[in-house]
Amino acid sequence: KRAFYFLATTESEAQSMKRFAGVLSRTTKNPMLSKVTFTDWLDLFQVVADDHPDEKKVLVIDEFPYLVKTNPDFPSILQNAWDEVLKDHNVMLVLCGSLISMMKKHALAYDSPLYGRRTAQIRLMPLQFTDVYAAQNLSFEQAVEQYAITGGVPKYMEFFQTDEPLVEQIRRVVLSKNGFLYEEPDFLLNEEVQTPINYFSVLKAISDGNHKLSKIGMTMEQDTSAITPYLKTLIDLGFVIKNVPITEKNPERSRKSLYYVSDNFIRFWFRYVYPFKGELELDNQQIVLDEMGKDFKQKFVAFAYESICRNIFAELCRKGQIDFEPSRIGSYWCNDNEGDTEIDVAAVDNQHKRLFLGECKYHAKPEDV
């Protein structure tokens, strides 16, 4: 298929139109298009429609939210262009964006001008551990510890593809003021939400080990009703996950819900970077490395290892290496007369009425059975 690809940036609408015309000029091999000053998006989209009208074409607009930031009416402009120009001219329109909240609001939401015109949507998720491990030349231990930090986000993984010891990679990429990931959560939250400070407070409270709604509220000194909207947004953005025991029949109404930071890197950042930003600004990286020496493997990696084990279990079931057809995979916990019970890997096979229970431990030495 003939393809037009346009990457939007933070620039004026006139500059965007000029660059879009350049894309059309290069793709159609018509140098005159780059010399024309376009003032109407509809004219630009008409060029796409008129190019090889009998052939199927793909028009990809990447970072679509930036065009909306420049001109809030752009979704309406695009709706008109689709209905009047593109729809009946063999054009497949693909909108991409890294700002989840804006993609939902301006492309998927019921009140968006584009609502009802999509034929599919794909939310790209981080890579699963089994896929990452299969593609890397790392020992199992190295892969687990790297994944505990990157969470399978390809861009983050790029910065950990060296032969350096992991601690040196962390120092260079995360702890250095010039490191690519030093301020990553700041950038993400500032782009996605309007009042980052409240979301920071929620993430910090959860990262400090407060997983019940009541404890998060107590830590923030706010009523639970006040922080629930923040939690919902963080869940929608993929930063937080709400877990309930695997056996709960009505998860949405469960009183056993626990909240966790689901993004591995954000969890790492709030645990080891955020509390020591003052020291890191003074280039004192050793204080973080000393803090990591206390519990990085025993607690931080061990927690991530539980979700890794659930991923491995799902993959083994899929391949038929474990005779189990899971309907749901998660974990289980309860409080009884004998104390707290926690099961790291719990799965339900509704078809055969079976339950799978497993425990996973991440230690330096093999665990006795």
What is each residue range found by the language model?
Residues K1-D290:
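Phosphate-binding site recognition
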Residues R253, S257-V369:
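A cross-kingdom feature that marks ATP-driven nucleic-acid transaction machinery
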